[in-house]
């Protein structure tokens, strides 16, 4: 079973086999999911391409940006827990980054709590596969830096809500029964990367700082996707991530 997948024995190969010696260029990295935000970063900030995540279906360039005097790595992440978690491992090797700021959109399970607020996850339900290779089995994984992120949002006087979230691999299998079960357990949003990326960071001793903006709404009589584009691409998330980078 997938829940038996955690095995801390020696690996057969690793990042060095694909990329050579590790680079040490910066400590902080932004995990970007929005193509529009990433294009804005490339247009706005001085940057240098320092490597690339390479696979048979394409190349993902990795950059180090100069943002307000800080050296911050950044790249356009693949979607989904397994791919996003693999990207983090590769980018650590290519840049030396050990502090990852990840932000993106989510679906709201409780619009009364999330509307008009940033969501700061405290735990994530592990309905994906990657986390079980990097952490012992459990229903939830703790998002360890939630209190740190919360303190930064409060300092910046940004509206926010703490809560559990649900990480799924199956975007078209968010069913009514699962919705009800997760909401009963206290989940307020659903997304596709956090549990796996948090497990990877915990395994290697790296830090993850995550926040979300809800776009589509699942707790209404009719599924509402009207806010998703803004949740994906609004630049306010980038500016918040920069403020987090200043403080970690």
Can you say where each PLM-predicted feature lies in the sequence?
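Generic non-transmembrane alpha-helical segments
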Residues: 148-156, 200, 240-248
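Metabolite-binding pocket within alpha/beta catalytic cores that recognizes anionic/polar moieties
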Residues: 1-143, 147-148, 203
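Active-site rim beta-loop-alpha module in soluble metabolic enzymes
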Residues: 139-184
